[in-house]
């Protein structure tokens, strides 16, 4: 027996199929691009520049820097790998403005970005900030034998032993 609504069945099925294909539940998000974390300095922290996040506008560079803390670093009762520092560097004026920090707990969970952009200040010669500026402004490549890390976890595995030994470029 035929229903009066049979004439709409094909259209309904086509619309349902289209809605399912366009649904966010069915959409596949592309895998995030691997990081390119280049070691810039080793001191109290191992400092890596995220080369994929470098944004240039004239002589001004916006970037983020991964600070890897020494093994066993805790704040309160939680273990931390380190954190992301967000920076604005003026390569011509040789100044840096800190623009926030996001912690990274052991295991890789990132905290929110906190802090506002501070006024620009001159780079201190020989500091970690100076090393970062040399990497992004002058194409300096210290630690040439140290591999570029493609994840935060890899940077932690590379950086922590270097902090212990006090590696030099």
Task: Report the location of each language-model feature.
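Bacterial N-terminal signal peptides that target proteins for export
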Residues: 2-15
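N-terminal secretory-pathway/extracellular module detecting exported/lumenal segments
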Residues: 25-169
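Detector for methionine-enriched segments
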Residues: 1, 19-20, 51
């Amino acid at each position: 027996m035929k229903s009066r609504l049979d004439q709409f069945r094909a259209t309904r099925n086509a619309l349902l199929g289209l809605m399912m294909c366009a649904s966010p539940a069915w959409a596949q998000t592309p895998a995030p691009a691997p990081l390119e974390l280049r070691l810039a300095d080793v001191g109290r922290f191992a400092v890596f520049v995220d080369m994929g996040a470098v944004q240039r506008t004239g002589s001004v560079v916006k970037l983020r820097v991964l600070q890897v803390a020494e093994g066993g670093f805790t704040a309160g009762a939680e273990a931390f790998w380190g954190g992301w520092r967000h920076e604005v560097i003026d390569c011509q004026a040789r100044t840096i403005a800190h623009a926030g920090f996001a912690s990274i707990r052991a295991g890789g969970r990132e905290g929110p970005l906190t802090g506002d952009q501070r006024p620009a200040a001159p780079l201190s010669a020989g500091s970690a900030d100076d090393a970062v500026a040399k990497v992004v402004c002058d194409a300096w490549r210290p630690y040439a034998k140290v591999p570029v890390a493609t994840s935060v976890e890899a940077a932690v595995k590379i950086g922590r032993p270097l902090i212990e030994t006090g590696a030099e470029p």
